[in-house]
Amino acid sequence: MGFFSSLGQINVWSLLRPIIESDLEVIVIALGGYVLAKKGFLPRDAQKVISSLNVYFFTPCLVFEKVGNGLNLKMLIDLSLLPVFYVIISAASILISFLLAKLFRLTPRQRNFATACITFQNSNSLPLALVSSLATTVKDLLWDKIPDDTPDKVASRGIMYLLIFSQLGQALRWSYGYRILLSPNQPEDPLPIGNRSWSHSDVNEEEIQNLLASSANVDGVQNSVQANEGSTVQTDSSAISKNDNVQVETSNEEVGGFGAASSKISKFIVLLLDFFSPPLYSLFIALFIAVVPPLQRFFFEEGSFVEGSITSGIRMAGQVAVPMILVVLGASLATDISKTEPTQEVRKNNDTRVIIVCLLGRMVVVPLALLPAFSLLSYFSEISTVDDPVFVVVIFLLVGSPTAIQLTQICQLNGVFERECAKVLWWSYAVFTPPNSLLLAFASLLVVKWTK
């Protein structure tokens, strides 16, 4: 009865309103991109240019302003447990995506895409709006360990939790997601046997042309060698022996000194730097500024010259990032729907399976697997953060949140799964998010009441 009396405190419309507002905000901007693409203003090449601009400039500006101004050293120390929760949630999501991919017989590339959709959730707009709404309407979210706790303090703590999770998600999304899961360098999936005749003949013709071109180049090189040296055989043999000597000398030098070790270290550094992305660089710089109070005051102190000029410019550029992502999302929907391919029917069937796995994993299986375990932890644990009622709400909304909109930006930039990503996001936000978010909000309040 206690739970139902606490539910009586909630105005259902006040909970539904931020959900509907967040969804309509996404749909309206994406619809603008859809119409522009249909009218021919945003062809595929233009979409890729916009995505590149966003990744290399606007998104780093957004990350810098949010992290540098929103975090500080004390906050990071107090909330040091949150990365552990994020690792557990991400690892469980990856495991679930692999199991679903095996069950639905997805190819390795499709499995990687599904893993990205299931692992990377929206931790900004939608959960933020819901937490802010619940904080002002539900008295049970007041924490008895904080004297004189108020709805404003509850909302501040909820936003702080979401901000930490959001930046952890940014780091994983722009490293593991950008460079591995959605990398453009993955091998292509084989077509079914019934459709191989078309692609096989096309590939053979291209291979023959490449071989003929390379053969002509080799002939040209041999003729020039004969003209200059007079004997192709002698030149080749002398070149071979010379190369052998050089290789032996080089290998001896590397074995004898530190050449091999330094070469491996330099290669590792190059690979590590290549693994990072512009938003990730921006995140590290912003974190450094956030944990050094003089630097944070220098950039973000209100009324200062730097805050009113440089920081204000960065903030203005960052505000463009999310609308541009949504415009490209709508444009990619329009472009992909009108796109025709020889293997369209086969790809359509495969797309349906991938989209089902993404939606099922992100919106259903992951919450069902993780939230009961977290509810038990919240009931029995003595950890202070876990005991915070608004933290329980944040975890519920985060675990069941739809796929991150930013994923379409990565797919567009790398040229992979653009159509599938657009469809996953459309179904997530337009169909499943309103009832799913409402159910998660009520379930989290039930757990809060149970643990008190």
Swiss-Prot record:
Q: Which GO terms describe its molecular function?
A: transmembrane transporter activity
Chief place of localization: membrane
Keywords, A to Z? Membrane, Transmembrane, Transmembrane helix, Transport
TM region positions: 18-38, 81-101, 269-289, 317-337, 354-374, 390-410, 428-448
Record bears the keyword Membrane: yes
This protein's source sits in the domain of life called: Eukaryota
Gene Ontology terms, cellular component aspect?
A: endoplasmic reticulum; membrane
The keyword Transport belongs to this UniProt entry's keyword annotation: yes
User: Which InterPro entries does this chain map to?
Assistant: Mem_transp_PIN-like (IPR004776)
Intracellular or extracellular location(s): Membrane
The record describes its membrane topology as: Multi-pass membrane protein
Please report which protein family the annotation says this sequence is part of: Belongs to the auxin efflux carrier (TC 2.A.69) family.
The entry's protein name is Uncharacterized transporter C5D6.04
